[in-house]
A protein has these predicted regions:
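A short glycine-rich beta-strand->turn/loop micro-motif centered on a GG-aromatic cluster
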Residues: 117-122, 141-155, 173
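Glycine-rich oxoanion-binding loops at beta->alpha junctions
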Residues: 92-103
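Histidine-anchored nucleotide/phosphate-binding helix
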Residues: 32-36, 128-138
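Short acidic-hydrophobic, aromatic-tinged amphipathic segments that line or gate anion-handling sites
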Residues: 91-92, 171-173
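Active-site acidic carboxylates
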Residues: 1-90, 110-111, 153, 159-166
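Short amphipathic alpha-helix with an adjacent loop that forms part of the alpha/beta core around
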Residues: 101-112
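Active-site-proximal beta-strand/loop segments in catalytic clefts of secreted hydrolases
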Residues: 46-49, 94, 121, 148-149
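A short helix->loop->beta-strand "cap" motif at the edges of active sites that frequently abuts
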Residues: 39-41, 139-142
Length: 173
Protein backbone atom coordinates (compact mmCIF):
# COMPACT_ATOMS: atom_id res chain seq x y z
CA UNK A 1 0.00 0.00 0.00
CA UNK A 2 1.28 3.44 -0.91
CA UNK A 3 0.96 5.94 1.91
CA UNK A 4 0.60 9.58 0.88
CA UNK A 5 1.12 12.65 3.05
CA UNK A 6 -0.67 15.87 2.17
CA UNK A 7 0.90 18.99 3.66
CA UNK A 8 -1.87 21.55 3.50
CA UNK A 9 -1.08 25.28 3.21
CA UNK A 10 1.98 25.50 5.46
CA UNK A 11 2.55 28.99 4.11
CA UNK A 12 4.11 32.00 5.76
CA UNK A 13 0.86 33.99 5.83
CA UNK A 14 -0.87 31.19 7.77
CA UNK A 15 2.03 30.45 10.13
CA UNK A 16 3.35 33.82 11.26
CA UNK A 17 2.18 36.23 8.58
CA UNK A 18 -1.11 38.01 7.85
CA UNK A 19 -3.28 35.21 9.31
CA UNK A 20 -0.69 33.55 11.54
CA UNK A 21 -1.36 32.23 15.02
CA UNK A 22 0.68 30.93 17.93
CA UNK A 23 -0.95 27.53 17.37
CA UNK A 24 0.23 27.48 13.74
CA UNK A 25 3.80 28.21 14.81
CA UNK A 26 3.57 25.51 17.48
CA UNK A 27 2.73 22.71 15.00
CA UNK A 28 5.89 23.19 12.90
CA UNK A 29 7.90 20.49 14.74
CA UNK A 30 4.98 18.06 14.44
CA UNK A 31 4.56 18.72 10.72
CA UNK A 32 8.30 18.13 10.26
CA UNK A 33 8.01 14.91 12.28
CA UNK A 34 5.31 13.65 9.90
CA UNK A 35 7.19 14.74 6.76
CA UNK A 36 10.25 12.78 7.96
CA UNK A 37 8.20 9.56 7.88
CA UNK A 38 7.61 9.75 4.11
CA UNK A 39 9.61 9.56 0.91
CA UNK A 40 9.40 12.81 -1.01
CA UNK A 41 7.65 11.05 -3.88
CA UNK A 42 4.76 10.36 -1.48
CA UNK A 43 4.37 13.93 -0.23
CA UNK A 44 2.10 16.46 -1.88
CA UNK A 45 1.83 20.02 -0.60
CA UNK A 46 -0.79 22.65 -1.33
CA UNK A 47 -0.54 26.41 -1.46
CA UNK A 48 -3.51 28.72 -1.03
CA UNK A 49 -3.10 31.01 -4.04
CA UNK A 50 -4.87 34.31 -4.61
CA UNK A 51 -4.58 37.05 -7.25
CA UNK A 52 -3.66 40.67 -6.59
CA UNK A 53 -7.40 41.41 -6.78
CA UNK A 54 -8.15 39.13 -3.82
CA UNK A 55 -10.14 41.80 -1.97
CA UNK A 56 -12.58 41.93 -4.90
CA UNK A 57 -13.32 38.19 -4.73
CA UNK A 58 -16.15 36.59 -2.78
CA UNK A 59 -13.63 35.18 -0.29
CA UNK A 60 -11.96 38.58 0.03
CA UNK A 61 -15.28 40.23 0.84
CA UNK A 62 -15.91 37.67 3.61
CA UNK A 63 -12.31 37.44 4.85
CA UNK A 64 -10.98 40.95 4.21
CA UNK A 65 -7.34 40.19 4.99
CA UNK A 66 -5.05 40.01 1.95
CA UNK A 67 -3.09 36.77 2.20
CA UNK A 68 -1.28 34.22 0.05
CA UNK A 69 -1.11 36.57 -2.92
CA UNK A 70 0.76 34.65 -5.62
CA UNK A 71 4.44 35.54 -5.72
CA UNK A 72 4.57 37.27 -2.33
CA UNK A 73 6.64 36.16 0.66
CA UNK A 74 3.43 35.22 2.50
CA UNK A 75 2.40 32.87 -0.32
CA UNK A 76 5.60 30.84 -0.05
CA UNK A 77 5.84 27.64 1.96
CA UNK A 78 7.11 28.68 5.41
CA UNK A 79 10.93 28.66 5.59
CA UNK A 80 10.87 26.14 8.45
CA UNK A 81 8.98 23.66 6.23
CA UNK A 82 10.20 24.44 2.70
CA UNK A 83 13.53 22.55 2.86
CA UNK A 84 11.79 19.39 4.10
CA UNK A 85 9.44 19.30 1.10
CA UNK A 86 11.84 20.63 -1.53
CA UNK A 87 11.30 18.56 -4.67
CA UNK A 88 7.81 17.41 -3.68
CA UNK A 89 4.77 18.09 -5.81
CA UNK A 90 3.11 21.39 -4.85
CA UNK A 91 -0.42 22.13 -6.02
CA UNK A 92 -1.62 25.72 -6.01
CA UNK A 93 -5.30 26.04 -5.16
CA UNK A 94 -7.58 29.06 -5.54
CA UNK A 95 -9.89 28.18 -2.67
CA UNK A 96 -10.25 26.05 0.45
CA UNK A 97 -10.52 22.63 -1.16
CA UNK A 98 -8.53 21.60 -4.21
CA UNK A 99 -10.32 19.65 -6.91
CA UNK A 100 -6.94 19.34 -8.67
CA UNK A 101 -5.47 17.66 -5.58
CA UNK A 102 -8.46 15.35 -5.31
CA UNK A 103 -8.23 14.41 -9.01
CA UNK A 104 -4.51 13.69 -8.58
CA UNK A 105 -5.21 11.40 -5.61
CA UNK A 106 -7.97 9.61 -7.54
CA UNK A 107 -5.58 9.07 -10.46
CA UNK A 108 -2.95 7.54 -8.17
CA UNK A 109 -5.59 5.28 -6.59
CA UNK A 110 -6.42 3.75 -9.97
CA UNK A 111 -2.94 2.24 -10.20
CA UNK A 112 -2.37 1.16 -6.60
CA UNK A 113 -3.93 0.84 -3.19
CA UNK A 114 -3.36 4.02 -1.18
CA UNK A 115 -3.99 5.72 2.13
CA UNK A 116 -3.88 9.46 2.69
CA UNK A 117 -2.80 11.41 5.76
CA UNK A 118 -3.22 15.18 6.09
CA UNK A 119 -1.34 17.74 8.17
CA UNK A 120 -1.27 21.52 8.05
CA UNK A 121 -3.41 24.62 8.14
CA UNK A 122 -6.10 25.49 8.85
CA UNK A 123 -7.84 22.45 10.33
CA UNK A 124 -11.23 24.13 10.19
CA UNK A 125 -10.98 25.46 6.63
CA UNK A 126 -8.54 23.89 4.18
CA UNK A 127 -7.66 20.66 5.98
CA UNK A 128 -11.30 19.68 6.52
CA UNK A 129 -12.23 20.75 2.96
CA UNK A 130 -9.54 18.61 1.36
CA UNK A 131 -10.08 15.64 3.68
CA UNK A 132 -13.80 15.66 2.88
CA UNK A 133 -13.22 15.98 -0.88
CA UNK A 134 -10.88 12.99 -0.84
CA UNK A 135 -13.18 10.94 1.40
CA UNK A 136 -16.12 11.74 -0.90
CA UNK A 137 -14.22 10.79 -4.06
CA UNK A 138 -12.64 7.68 -2.53
CA UNK A 139 -14.89 6.48 0.30
CA UNK A 140 -13.12 3.13 0.68
CA UNK A 141 -9.60 4.43 1.28
CA UNK A 142 -8.17 5.24 4.67
CA UNK A 143 -8.05 9.00 5.19
CA UNK A 144 -6.39 10.28 8.36
CA UNK A 145 -5.61 13.64 9.93
CA UNK A 146 -2.79 14.09 12.45
CA UNK A 147 -4.40 16.33 15.07
CA UNK A 148 -1.20 17.66 16.64
CA UNK A 149 0.20 18.52 13.20
CA UNK A 150 -2.76 20.75 12.37
CA UNK A 151 -4.01 24.04 13.76
CA UNK A 152 -7.27 25.86 13.27
CA UNK A 153 -8.17 29.51 13.22
CA UNK A 154 -8.89 29.04 16.93
CA UNK A 155 -8.43 26.06 19.26
CA UNK A 156 -12.23 25.66 19.43
CA UNK A 157 -12.70 25.57 15.66
CA UNK A 158 -9.76 23.16 15.38
CA UNK A 159 -11.54 20.78 17.78
CA UNK A 160 -14.87 21.22 16.00
CA UNK A 161 -13.30 20.36 12.63
CA UNK A 162 -11.66 17.26 14.08
CA UNK A 163 -15.02 16.15 15.47
CA UNK A 164 -16.71 16.75 12.11
CA UNK A 165 -14.08 14.74 10.26
CA UNK A 166 -14.27 11.90 12.78
CA UNK A 167 -18.04 11.75 12.28
CA UNK A 168 -17.39 11.35 8.53
CA UNK A 169 -15.12 8.34 9.15
CA UNK A 170 -11.84 10.19 8.76
CA UNK A 171 -9.29 8.83 11.25
CA UNK A 172 -8.05 11.38 13.75
CA UNK A 173 -4.59 10.43 14.93
Amino acid sequence: MRKLLLVIDMQTDFVDGALGTAEAVAIIPNVLREIAKYEKSNIIATRDTHPDEYMETREGRHLPVPHCIKGTAGWQIHPAIAPAIDGCLVIDKPTFGSTALCEHIVKISKDEEISVTLVGLCTDICVVSNAMLIKTALPEIEVSVVADACAGVTPDTHSAALTTMKMCQINII
